[in-house]
Amino acid sequence: MSDTLETAVHDDATTTPSTRREADEPDRNRRLLLFASTYGTLVFLGALMALFTVLSEIILGDQRFLTGANLSLVLRQSAVLAILAGGLTVVLLLGEFDLSIAASMTLGGAMFAQFAQGSYVFTWPSIPFTDIGGGAILGTSWQANAMFALFAALLFGLIVGLLNGLIVAQFGVTAFIATLGMAGIIDGYLVKLTDGRSVPLPAGVTDAAQGTVLGWKAPASWNWIVEPFGKTFEFNLVGLSIPSIALAAAAVLFVLWVFLNHTEAGRRMDAVGGNVEASRLAGINVRRYRMAAFVICAVVAALAGIVLAAGRTGSAVTLVGNQSSYLLQAFTACFLGAVSLREGEFHIVGTVIGVALMTVTFSGLIILGVPGYAQTIANGVILIAALTFAGIARRAAAAT
């Protein structure tokens, strides 16, 4: 008994505050590494905004990054990419990918413009060697309505998604081949339809799409001056507005978030992406949900094209190659999002963070006068750096 008591007293005496700190050190390091792997992208986003704010003052002599005009421009520029990447997230969540999203986006914008200006109408099929058929189904003036043009253009996206899903899910063709081939088909169709020329949109459509929410602008009181370390920084947010297309993007992303996180179909898609065989054994129709994912992706991509044409450029680009940069940007945003908040999982909130990171980077580089080729390089560097950092932090946390 006395030996046991003596041992306990000895052990307690040897457990000093310094040894307890040493024992807690691995846990503390592991928590820090887990935080870095989970929230590193958000921290990097905040650091970039601070960096561009400071560099703008130092290099340019005044604040051009954190201003109302520039933040409004960032919101406007990010809207199209956010919608496109949001739709792509659904496909990536299921372990597939879609290389036709830029083509679907181009198709959506082009068909919307064609319908809106009355250049394209749905007609009855004609019977050869007769005068039967060939007339407009709903009347030319009715089909030129902006709302009809919107739904008709989305219908083309729906058809593309159905074809992609059918080829991949039903016929077993790899998504790489199927969607790459579909992009070529869409490109050829648009060249045949428009001769590769841009299609202008009616002024009424562009005026509405390029406006701001309720016409609101930040008042004159939104102008702050801070003086840290004897240096004066002016943050002039006067004139900050919320573009209508930014609100549209937020609405689309919210619907996708609700669908994926709070509906039975969304949870089943998540299950299919996590383990296909287990989902099949659980009675989930894997083919149906894979097809649905491609349909959602293509329809949302077509909507992104409509937003781009109406809310940004005022006309629809009809050559897929002219918008191919959106393909890489959308994938980059999604993969950046996969290392944000949820480890290695594609999700809408993460995609939004990825889009914000990319748009802020491009905006800052443009303001600082960095050449266009360097901006493209930065796109790839950000993706590689973010994924590498997250992987290193994750492995270090597991080894701790």
Residue ranges and their predicted role:
Residues 3-85, 120-148:
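Membrane-interfacial amphipathic/re-entrant helices at transmembrane-helix boundaries
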Residues 44-63, 94, 193-194, 256-264, ...:
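Structural signal for alpha-helical transmembrane segments and their membrane-water exit/capping regions
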Residues 47-56, 68-122, 166-173, 331-349, ...:
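Single transmembrane alpha-helix segments in multi-pass membrane proteins
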Residues 61-73, 190-197, 237-240, 257-266, ...:
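Inter-helical junctions in multi-pass inner-membrane proteins, predominant
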Residues 122-183, 353:
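Alpha-helical transmembrane segments within multi-pass membrane transporters and channels
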Residues 128-141, 147, 179-262, 312-323, ...:
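Transmembrane helix-bundle core of multi-pass membrane transporters
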Residues 295, 301, 311-380:
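Transmembrane alpha-helical segments in multi-pass inner-membrane proteins
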